[in-house]
Structures are given as C-alpha cells and as structure tokens.
Amino acid sequence: MKSYLTALDDGSFMRVQYGSKINGLLVEYYDKDFNLTGTKIIGKELPVFGGFYATKDNYYVVTGENNTDEDNTKEVYRITKYDKHWNKITSTGLTNCNTTKPFNAGSCRIDVSGNYMIIHTCHEMYKSDDGYNHQANVTIQVDIDKMKITDSYTVVMDQRGSRILHNG
C-alpha cells in the first residue's frame, strides 16, 4: 500500500502517498467535500517506503534501505516521528536484522496500543545455507514516547511455529 487517507479532527481529510518520482511523500489536504485545499512534499528518510500511520498527536512513517551486502551495521528499517505539521521530531532505526530487502513481497501494517507501536511487515533475508534469499515476516515493537525499538523478530521461524495446533 502506497497511499493512505485519514480523517482530520476538523472533518477534513489528508491523503499521504509515496512517490518515487517526487523522492518522498506527497501530502494532500481535502475539505469535507473532498475538494483539494493544499499540498505538501515531505522528503524521504530512507529510499524504500514501507508505511504511514497517524495517531492523535503525531504522524509516523516507516522506511527502509536495501542491504544486499548483508552488512549487520547498516540501518535497514527506520521509523520517523513527525508532529501534525510534518515537522520531524525524531527517528529510530533497526540494524543487524537479517534483511537484504525490507518490505519485499508483502505489505507493512502498523498499529498502536498505549505507548507501543507494532509494525508487522516482511523482508528478504540473508542468503541461507541452501543458497537462496528467502522471504519472511518481520515484527518490530517501538516505544513511541521514547522512540526506542523495544523488540523485533526477523529470524526464520521453525515451520511448526507457523501452524496452529490443538488437541482434540
């Protein structure tokens, strides 16, 4: 998903869309009748767009960068926090995450509960013993008050872990 529509407190709307030709985010504002009232361009943080999320007080953008050299020191995922006027507040990033291509072959879903943002997305992983770069899920947890990553899961899960088991 590269385009997001969100309702604003005054009944108007804001559309956020990633655009590779504009090298960032296009933000469009619409009145309650969907007449365009303004636009803004927000420069991108990292070159690969993942997702956008709006809370009551802030906007968040998740971006990434390819890491085909399998460099554990390279920032591959970045979560950037903005105020409601699109002024950058801060960001936090994830390195050493078994990722060559963030957001590859899937989507980026984001939700917030309390102080915690959960990002569930995907990636192409480092080359495995069979010589392939497999695709898998990624989960990142961020304390959005401190803008610190508090947990992440980027490794291969045992096949049995991906099934729902029950006794019956």
Describe each PLM feature range.
Residues 1-25, 45-46:
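Beta-strand-rich domains and repeat architectures in extracellular enzymes and scaffolds
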Residues 26-30, 74-86, 132-147:
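Beta-propeller blade signature
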Residues 36-68, 75, 93-98:
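Blade-loop segments of beta-propeller domains
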Residues 1-7, 45-55, 100-110, 154-168:
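Repeated scaffold domains used in trafficking and secretory/extracellular systems
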Residues 10-15, 57-62, 115-120:
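Entry beta-strands of beta-propeller and related beta-repeat scaffolds
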Residues 1, 36-42, 88-100, 148-154:
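A short beta-strand motif characteristic of beta-propeller blades
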Residues 74-77, 88-113, 122-128, 134, ...:
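Asp-box/WD-like beta-propeller blade repeats and closely related beta-sheet repeat scaffolds
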Residues 19-23, 66-71, 124-130:
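Short glycine/acidic-enriched loop and turn motifs that connect beta-strands
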